[in-house]
């Protein structure tokens, strides 16, 4: 049958069509194989978390999705150092590091630094050699260690807490989309406008260098 408001398909079968029928009888076996591979991987990385290394909390790209958060590729070098860790050491204790990523806001830096500190507080670090160093677990603590099979510190969407109240006249007149578009335009053209003002100050007689003010109509 067709899906949605689309045309009902007609196969027009010709030329011994039975030979070209695709079957999916291997789906149960594939499901079993995926499960066995997950178990095999969990045993190989034990006692480390089966889900892999810790990932940062990042915003989704584009205006459409930037209100949502998800798990990113790796923590920035700035986040790692702000949490009191070394990037090389962080990789050895199950923390993903992405040197290409940059922090564009103080909020993202604070959230991920707190995430790293919380992970470090929960972590039971096994000693590499016979001698137990500072920050490593002793024998009693190592006996309590169990492998985490589920998601490692899953990312949760921030729930907005709003109280019901009357909408003010100022809020009714405020156009959020136009305000955001204007703010992005100002941020984009700040360098061009600064250069234009500088050129106009250096050449006061040049009419082409003078800044032009454009008055926009209210919509």
From Swiss-Prot:
Subcellular location: Cytoplasm
PANTHER family: 60S RIBOSOMAL PROTEIN L13, LARGE RIBOSOMAL SUBUNIT PROTEIN EL13
Signal sequence bounds: none
Protein name from the UniProt record: Large ribosomal subunit protein eL13
Self-association and partners: Component of the 60S large ribosomal subunit (LSU).
Function of the protein: Component of the ribosome, a large ribonucleoprotein complex responsible for the synthesis of proteins in the cell. The small ribosomal subunit (SSU) binds messenger RNAs (mRNAs) and translates the encoded message by selecting cognate aminoacyl-transfer RNA (tRNA) molecules. The large subunit (LSU) contains the ribosomal catalytic site termed the peptidyl transferase center (PTC), which catalyzes the formation of peptide bonds, thereby polymerizing the amino acids delivered by tRNAs into a polypeptide chain.
Coiled coil: none
GO biological process, one term: translation
A GO molecular-function annotation: structural constituent of ribosome
GO cellular component: cytosol; cytosolic large ribosomal subunit
Lineage summary: Eukaryota, Metazoa, Ecdysozoa, Arthropoda, Hexapoda
Keywords assigned: Cytoplasm, Ribonucleoprotein, Ribosomal protein
Family under the similarity heading: Belongs to the eukaryotic ribosomal protein eL13 family.
HAMAP family assigned: Ribosomal_eL13
Region (Disordered): 198-219
Annotated source species: Spodoptera frugiperda
Pfam families: Ribosomal_L13e
InterPro entries cross-referenced by the UniProt entry: Ribosomal_eL13, Ribosomal_eL13_CS
